[in-house]
Structures are given as structure tokens and as C-alpha cells.
Swiss-Prot record:
Principal localisation: other
Keyword Signal: no
The family this protein is said to belong to: Belongs to the gas vesicle GvpF/GvpL family.
One term under GO cellular component: gas vesicle
Self-association state and partner proteins as the record states: Binds GvpA.
Pfam families, alphabetized: GvpL_GvpF (PF06386)
Subcellular location: Gas vesicle
Provenance organism: Dolichospermum flosaquae (Anabaena flos-aquae)
GO biological process entries: gas vesicle organization
PANTHER family the record matches: PROTEIN GVPL 2
Function (record text): A minor component of the gas vesicle, may be involved in preventing GvpA aggregation during gas vesicle nucleation. Gas vesicles (GV) are hollow, gas filled proteinaceous nanostructures. During planktonic growth they allow positioning of the organism at a favorable depth for light or nutrient acquisition.
Key words, A-Z: Gas vesicle
Name this protein carries in UniProt: Gas vesicle protein F
Gene symbol of the encoding locus: gvpF
Length: 245
């Protein structure tokens, strides 16, 4: 009976066994060439892996350590992928998607994924916005203590929302104008929290990261304490390595 395999990622070049990596359940990570693709894997000790912080970080660490070793072009596989044998990989992944896998490798060659998440204090922004729009502030203040119709409540709420959205878009536009020219491809995702106003990944030339990072720093200084910027400059290219359904 074959031992199930936990998969981490796919590479266009062979990964030597001299690269020592520790995977999930503290199992050694190996490489296996299937057709023309090199897979990083370890023996699976569980049928299903819990998406705990430790397990997720271990999965990411395997890929990032491989990238640090010089194998920068890769297709990261989703966390928790366990297969029973390599024949399953041939029949379910390589045979139906071989051309697309090669196209993804070509797209990612010489490129890296970086990501930006921008946060602001929603309450502070609302207060600042009201202070800069005295007519809107006066309109809201005049309504305090009064019995309002549903139409009046909706109207003032919409005016506030429109002005906050304009402030948000003005911030995003600064980032877009400065950073978008670096990117071959950009994916903007939905914010994950109320405080997050922008969540984007950029596929940029590998050697452009230092200049990209400097631009982020300049923007950060421009906005000061108004924003919190979370910049990730080293990650496997999950966003740009998606197979079409």
C-alpha cells in the first residue's frame, strides 16, 4: 500500500535532494519529477490537515526556503493537498492542464509577487471628513434630537458614505499612480476588514522590488499616521498562479 503524499508546489526545474527542508509533521521534503514538472512533497501522516497557523506557516516556509535557495519560479499548491499516488497527479492535473501549467511558468519567469494592504481609522476619517465639510456637519447636527423620517436618515447616510468613499478613492489613487507602472499584472481583492481600504497584489520584475519598496516608503511618509501599510515583498505567487476552471 502506497503512502499518501502531501504536495507543496510545482517547479519547472529539478530540485536537488541536497536542499534539506522540513515539512508538515516534521517530515523531510523531497522532490519528484512527473512528466516534465518537479513536485515538492512529503509523506502525509494525516488524511486531512487542519488549517492551523502552524501548519499554514510550515507550508509557506517550505516554498519560501526553496525560493531563497534560488528556485524562484514556482506554482504554489493550495494548503492541504494530499494525493494517494503520482498517477493521480498525471490524470487529474498534468494531462488536462499541461499547456496551462507551462504558460503560467512562462508568465512568472523573472517575476515576483508583492502585496499591499492599506488600513485607516474609520472613525477618525469620518471626523476629519465632517470637519472639512461644514455644510454636511451642520446638516447632521441639525438632525440630532429630532424625529427623522426614513428618507431623511437614508439621505444623510448616503451623503456621508459618498464623501468617505471619495476620500478612500483619493488615497487609493495615490498608490495606483505610483505603483501600477511597475506591474505586469495587478489583482485587487476585497478588503478583509472594515479598517482595510485597499488589498492588492502586484506581479513585478524580480529586480524592481527595491525601487517598488522605496515608492511604498515614500507614500507611507506622505500620509504619516493617517494610514497603516502592510507590505509583503517575499511570498510564493499564489495570486498569479491560478489555473482556469
Amino acid at each position: 500500500m502506497s503512502i499518501p503524499l502531501y504536495l507543496y508546489g510545482i517547479f519547472p526545474n529539478t530540485i536537488p535532494e541536497t536542499l534539506e527542508l522540513e515539512g508538515l509533521d516534521k517530515q523531510p521534503v523531497h522532490s519528484q519529477v512527473v512528466d516534465e514538472f518537479c513536485f515538492l512533497y512529503s509523506e502525509a501522516r494525516q488524511e486531512k490537515y487542519l488549517a492551523s497557523r502552524r501548519n499554514l506557516l510550515t507550508h509557506e516556509k517550505v516554498l519560501e526556503q526553496t525560493m531563497h535557495a534560488g528556485f524562484r519560479v514556482l506554482l504554489p499548491l493550495r494548503f492541504g493537498l494530499v494525493v494517494k499516488d503520482w498517477e493521480t497527479i498525471m490524470s487529474q492535473l498534468i494531462n488536462p492542464h499541461k499547456d496551462q501549467l507551462n504558460q503560467l511558468f512562462q508568465k512568472l519567469a523573472g517575476k515576483r509577487e508583492v502585496s499591499i494592504k492599506i488600513f485607516w481609522d474609520a472613525k477618525a476619517e469620518l471626523q476629519t471628513m465632517m470637519e472639512s465639510h461644514q455644510d454636511l456637519k451642520q446638516q447632521r447636527d441639525n438632525m440630532e434630537g429630532k424625529k427623522l423620517s426614513m428618507e431623511e436618515v437614508i439621505q444623510i447616510g448616503q451623503l456621508i458614505e459618498i464623501n468617505l468613499l471619495a476620500r478612500k478613492q483619493a488615497v487609493i489613487e495615490v498608490f495606483s499612480q505610483e505603483l501600477n507602472p511597475f506591474a505586469q499584472e495587478i489583482v485587487v481583492s476585497d478588503p478583509m476588514t472594515e479598517e482595510m481600504i485597499y488589498n492588492a497584489a502586484f506581479l513585478i520584475p524580480w529586480e524592481s522590488e527595491s525601487e517598488f519598496s522605496e515608492r511604498v516608503e515614500v507614500i507611507d511618509q506622505k500620509f504619516g499616521d493617517r494610514l497603516r501599510i502592510r507590505y509583503n515583498n517575499f511570498t510564493a505567487p499564489y495570486t498569479f498562479a491560478q489555473l482556469d476552471s
